[in-house]
Each structure stands twice: as structure tokens, then as C-alpha cells.
Amino acid sequence: MGRREEMIAKIKELMTQPERIRNMGIAAHIDHGKTTLSDNLLAGAGMISEELAGKQLVLDFDEQEQARGITINAANVSMVHNYEGNDYLINLIDTPGHVDFGGDVTRAMRAIDGAIIVVDAVEGVMPQTETVLRQALREYVKPVLFINKVDRLIKELKLTPQQMQERFVKVITDVNRLIRRYAPPEFKDKWLVKVEDGSVAFGSAYYNWALSVPYMKKTGVSFKDIIDLTNAGDLKTLRKKAPLHVVVLDMVVKHLPNPLEAQKYRIPHLWRGDINSDVGQAMMNCDPKGPMTMVVTKIILDKHAGEVATGRVWSGTVKTGQEVYLINSKRKARIQQVGIYMGPERINMEAVPAGNIVAVTGLRDAMAGETVSVQQIEPFEALHYTSEPVVTVAIEAKNVKDLPKLVEALRQLAKEDPTLHVKIDEETGQHLLSGMGELHLEVKLHRLKTEWKLDVEVSPPIVVYRESVTKQSPIVEGKSPNKHNRFYITVEPMPDEIYQAIREGEIPEGRPKDPKAVAKKLAELGMDYEIAKGIVDIYNGNMFLDNTKGIQYLNEVMDLLVDGFHQAMDEGPLAKEPVMKVIVRLHDAKIHEDNVHRGPAQIYPAIRSAIHCAMMKAGPVLYEPYQKVIINVPYEYMGAVSRELNQRRGQLIDMRQEGEVMIIIGEAPVAEMFGFAGAIRGATSGKALWTTEHAGFKRVPNELAQQIIRQIRQRKGLDPNPPKEQDVCPQQ
């Protein structure tokens, strides 16, 4: 026990010295060795035994992750490392590299200031590497590079030192190209990684060794020594001469920023409040004496403690018994236990000051992404997720008495993972669960069975489509049921540039805090500034503009109009699927002076029917989600793979050969991708490795659209015939 207590005492001492803290993550493409690297860093820091590390995968502590060998939840661990005679506290957050868990990656990025990007020396920079690096840079997280699996270059590919150098240079060039492309303007050059200064290290996480130029200079170990030891199979000496954790954690301490440095440039970017307010200044300076503010990045369900929220403390000190506000959910809560994580184990502390990663209980109903503070401050920006839910399954409890338990379990899952959408269909009593892909949903359903011991019936997966329009509609009048309120609106397709800016988070969703700034941005993207000034709301990639002049009572009903706009966007006119890329403009209105005659029961149907009728007059179309598929396969199976893709309405985008392996990149509709895993394994005798990414939405071909609309409507218990304009527009 002595060692563990020593460790905790050391961590407590370092927590109060922000210049000695590094909050960092490890991000990579799936199977490039991220979790193995994390475990060996922990072993080096004395958290687990060295022999076990790498085989043990401490951070993959969910039994499902261990079975699948992929990291599903971002766990975090605090450890201590000595660099040039000083101790440093390193808070490590492990993030998943599998695309179906992209939401976890984005949230973890919010809590950290720096990241080790892991790239497999054999495979090089892969699409998912680009995705995680882009997310890191967008959250102002500084990267360093670890080139992994170098042992394979020596043993399997038998490369000469010269060829290896060329490999490394290619990886570094590719990573720097991405940093130049995605880094914030002021860091495009400063954050490039370089071999000379030690912001690049290379090695083998599995065999627990690593090298960097500063380490080679300091110790005299040469690259040739490494090749000889690897070929001789003398792994013990190798680990002693070039210990992974020393090289990598030295790089972390030297090149990644401490919270004092990082918060100065990260807070103005991540937080929309007034930087000169007392909270703003406290966060900029990472001040432990300021008002306590933290952002929740993850909710974990602990068997003993209930919901544990982990997050980053930006200012002040988190203490037991503190009364706090949950800003987004507009509630108060009281903090109960305060602690930190060492792997799956939570260790209680009396207080955790600014600049640290904390684990607290007592924040009932907090979601990942929640801002928690002792004052009512502006929330941190909504987190951007790179993909949106595209696949839905309907779930029913086999046993009726399990229903309350099922509702609770689904609520909990949605809370832990905001990229999972749960909807209860009141009419059929089914629960609809939407996620980012087949694997994402499989994992969640598995948890219902194992953690909640629930027996559920699951429908075959259903694809979530989107509805949109192709041209501008004429002005349409929407009347309230009592005929006392009239709204005159048009709808039109949203230009791609504007839609992209909303998806990328450059234009925030929701009611704009600063409409002028948003209007200016819209004007830069080609919208007429006079029209853009009317911006009222952005909702799921759709926009509501008020282009009226001096209408009486309009302000009083604006909230209701926005709610009605949301209802119309949640269920479009064709098949009650969500709407995307539509701009709704209000041109004129007549509103009853007595608020009794202009309540929700009057306003909602008026605006909803007007929007739906206008959409029917604007060339309504159906969009379907696409997936990008990246397949690594031996050369001889190439034909089988492209046939498999073609049968699924897919197309090949790119093919390149790396050694014996072909990398095939294709795109196909999600609807055609179910069962792809089995089919591709069969077609390639199990030799294909593949990952998928969300590739946005594309228009459904006309010949298929009618048939799909029929199927969706039938499934929802509606009249299966696709509606015509006269069915949706009220007859005048």
C-alpha cells in the first residue's frame, strides 16, 4: 500500500501548482496503439506492473472494450513523472479512435490542453487520424506526435535505417500538413512537430520502448542499437535503454502547455462570456481563488456512488458541499463527493483546484457538456460533434413490468452520451434509440443486457432520413385555427457554404447571442446582409429569419413561433423525418391584440402548417445519410471488395497501394451498409480491415425516393401514399 499512498500524497501536493500540471490526451486512428501506449505510460509511472502493461489495457476497463479490443469510453488517470529533477502531475484522458464513438473524442478534447497523436508507422496517417487531429486543433489543443509500431518496420518489413527515415519523414510531413490546414491561425507555424526539438518520438508501445532526438543526445543511445536489439529479440535491454514512458512523458512535459499558459488562449475561444468579468479573468488566469467553474466532459455510472461527473476545472476550487448552478439545464445542485481518477479507481479528495480534472457526485441530471459554476454565467459553447445520429432501432421490453427500468436505463445512456438520441413513441409505446452507426448501437444495447439485466426486443436497424427543398417557395399564408392570426412565410434551400459553417460550429446553433455578428458572418458567406439581420434561430442545420417591419405584438409571440419552427423541422411534410438545410423567412404577420387569442394552440398550427405547405411548393426532396468506408485488403481481394460496394449503391473514391495492401476508400448509403461486416469478411476470407466515417447526406435518387417515403410512412402508421401539395396545403 505504501507506494499507492505516496502517489496520492504526491498528486495532492502537485494539484495546487498549475505550472507543474499537464492535461493531455492520446488520440489516434483505431488500432494504431493508443490504449497500449496509455497503459505503458501508467506502468512507467508505477500505476500497474510492467509485465502486464500492454496486455492488460488498464484504460479499457469496460468488459466490452476488452472483448472488442477497442476503446469505447474516454477514461482518465492522474500520474506523476519526474523531468529534469522536478515532479509533474500528468492527467491522461484516453479517447476512442473508432468513428462510432466520435462524440467521446470531442468531449475529451474540451478537458485537455495537449494531445499525443499516435500514428502507426506501417499504415501512416489514416482518415480517422485526420478527424481526431482536426477536433483537437478546433478546440485549441496542442499536438505532439508519437510514431508507433516501429518494431514492425524492422522485423516484418525489414527496412534499412534509410528507408525508415523516409517513412518517418512522410508521416511527419503528413501530420504537419494537417496542422497547417486545421490549426488556429496564430498557431499554424508554432505548433508544427519537429524531430529536432523532440516534439516527435518514435517507438513501439507494445514492446515498451521509444526514442526521441533529445533523448538520444542525452543518453548516447543510437537508432542502430535499437535495430540490433530488436533483431536479437533482447526486449528487456531495449526497454531499459530506451524506456517508453520516460521518452514520451519527457516530450509531454517539455512541449505540451500547462493550464496557466493554455487557458490564456483557450478560454476566449471556448467561452462566449465577457472575458473582462471576474469569472472571465479567473478562468484566463486559472485562479484557484476565483469563482468555481467547470465543464462536465463525461458522466459515468458507478455501482456505489451513482452518477459520477468528470470534468475540467477552469477557475476556483471544487469542494464538497458547494452549491452550484447547472447552466444549460437551469437547475441548482449540491456537490457531494470530490475526487480524481486513477484508472477505474476513484480517490476522494477534500478539494480540487483550477487546472485539474475532477470527478464529482451530486450533479443529478447533468449531461456531458454541461457548464457548472457557483455563479450564473454564460455557458461554454455547445460541443460540436463531427457526426450526427443516422441509425435508429426500436426497443421494447419483453416483460411489461421492466418498462420503468428500461425508461431509466435509456435516460441514463442518453445522459452519458449526448450523441445518442432517445425518443419515446407515445402511440406505439416503442422506444427509439438513434446512434452514429451499427457498432455504436450494438454497444449500448449490450449494456442494457449486462448492466441493467434487461431483456429487450430490438427491431432491425432503421435509417434516419432528412427532408429538404430544392427551390424557393412562393409566399404562403398560415392561419391560426381561430383565424385571428396570420403569418406569411417562404422557405428556400440553404446554400452549402452556410450549412457547412453551421456544421463546423463557425455559426453557433440556437438563438444567437450576438445577432449582428452572425448576420455579418452570413453576409460574408453570400447572404444579403439586410435579410441576414433578421436571424432569430438556427436549429439542426435550419434557419429562421424575421424579415418583417414593425409588426405589432410580434415580439410577444416570437418564442412560440420559434417553438413551432422547431416542430416543423423535427417532422417534415413528406414522411415526418427531420428537416435539414432549409431557411424559413417570415415576411409579414397579423396578430390578435388579446393574448388569449394568440396562445400556443393558435400559433403552433399556424406556423407549422405554413412551413410544411411552403416546403411542398419548394420542390421537396429526401436526403439519406452516407458512410465513407476505408478498407485495407490484400491485393487479390480488390475485385471482391469493389463488387461488394457496387452492389450497395456505393462508389469508389480512391485506391492506393501500400506494399502488399490495397487501401480502398468508398462511399455508400447507410441504408445499404447493414450486414456489410459479415459480407466483407466472407468475400475476403476475413482478411479485410475496415472502418467507417459519417460522410454527410446526399439526395435520394428520384426513382427510389417515392418507394422509401412509402416505407417510412407505413412504418410510422401513416397513410403510405406520398403526400401531394393539396394534401398538405389548407384549401383556401
Curated annotation (Swiss-Prot):
<dbReference type="GO" id="GO:0005525">
    <property type="term" value="F:GTP binding"/>
</dbReference>
<dbReference type="InterPro" id="IPR004543">
    <property type="entry name" value="Transl_elong_EFG/EF2_arc"/>
</dbReference>
<dbReference type="Pfam" id="PF03764">
    <property type="entry name" value="EFG_IV"/>
</dbReference>
<dbReference type="InterPro" id="IPR031157">
    <property type="entry name" value="G_TR_CS"/>
</dbReference>
<dbReference type="InterPro" id="IPR004161">
    <property type="entry name" value="EFTu-like_2"/>
</dbReference>
<dbReference type="InterPro" id="IPR000795">
    <property type="entry name" value="T_Tr_GTP-bd_dom"/>
</dbReference>
<dbReference type="InterPro" id="IPR009000">
    <property type="entry name" value="Transl_B-barrel_sf"/>
</dbReference>
<dbReference type="InterPro" id="IPR005517">
    <property type="entry name" value="Transl_elong_EFG/EF2_IV"/>
</dbReference>
<dbReference type="GO" id="GO:0006414">
    <property type="term" value="P:translational elongation"/>
</dbReference>
<dbReference type="InterPro" id="IPR005225">
    <property type="entry name" value="Small_GTP-bd"/>
</dbReference>
<feature type="binding site">
    <location>
        <begin position="148"/>
        <end position="151"/>
    </location>
    <ligand>
        <name>GTP</name>
    </ligand>
</feature>
<comment type="similarity">
    <text>Belongs to the TRAFAC class translation factor GTPase superfamily. Classic translation factor GTPase family. EF-G/EF-2 subfamily.</text>
</comment>
<dbReference type="GO" id="GO:1990904">
    <property type="term" value="C:ribonucleoprotein complex"/>
</dbReference>
<keyword id="KW-0648">Protein biosynthesis</keyword>
<dbReference type="Pfam" id="PF03144">
    <property type="entry name" value="GTP_EFTU_D2"/>
</dbReference>
<dbReference type="InterPro" id="IPR014721">
    <property type="entry name" value="Ribsml_uS5_D2-typ_fold_subgr"/>
</dbReference>
<dbReference type="Pfam" id="PF14492">
    <property type="entry name" value="EFG_III"/>
</dbReference>
<feature type="binding site">
    <location>
        <begin position="28"/>
        <end position="35"/>
    </location>
    <ligand>
        <name>GTP</name>
    </ligand>
</feature>
<keyword id="KW-0251">Elongation factor</keyword>
<dbReference type="Pfam" id="PF00679">
    <property type="entry name" value="EFG_C"/>
</dbReference>
<feature type="domain" description="tr-type G">
    <location>
        <begin position="19"/>
        <end position="260"/>
    </location>
</feature>
<keyword id="KW-0963">Cytoplasm</keyword>
<dbReference type="InterPro" id="IPR020568">
    <property type="entry name" value="Ribosomal_Su5_D2-typ_SF"/>
</dbReference>
<dbReference type="GO" id="GO:0003924">
    <property type="term" value="F:GTPase activity"/>
</dbReference>
<dbReference type="InterPro" id="IPR041095">
    <property type="entry name" value="EFG_II"/>
</dbReference>
<keyword id="KW-0342">GTP-binding</keyword>
<comment type="function">
    <text>Catalyzes the GTP-dependent ribosomal translocation step during translation elongation. During this step, the ribosome changes from the pre-translocational (PRE) to the post-translocational (POST) state as the newly formed A-site-bound peptidyl-tRNA and P-site-bound deacylated tRNA move to the P and E sites, respectively. Catalyzes the coordinated movement of the two tRNA molecules, the mRNA and conformational changes in the ribosome.</text>
</comment>
<dbReference type="InterPro" id="IPR035647">
    <property type="entry name" value="EFG_III/V"/>
</dbReference>
<keyword id="KW-0547">Nucleotide-binding</keyword>
<dbReference type="Pfam" id="PF00009">
    <property type="entry name" value="GTP_EFTU"/>
</dbReference>
<dbReference type="InterPro" id="IPR000640">
    <property type="entry name" value="EFG_V-like"/>
</dbReference>
<protein>
    <recommendedName>
        <fullName>Elongation factor 2</fullName>
    </recommendedName>
</protein>
<feature type="modified residue" description="Diphthamide">
    <location>
        <position position="597"/>
    </location>
</feature>
<feature type="binding site">
    <location>
        <begin position="94"/>
        <end position="98"/>
    </location>
    <ligand>
        <name>GTP</name>
    </ligand>
</feature>
<dbReference type="GO" id="GO:0005829">
    <property type="term" value="C:cytosol"/>
</dbReference>
<dbReference type="InterPro" id="IPR027417">
    <property type="entry name" value="P-loop_NTPase"/>
</dbReference>
<dbReference type="GO" id="GO:0003746">
    <property type="term" value="F:translation elongation factor activity"/>
</dbReference>
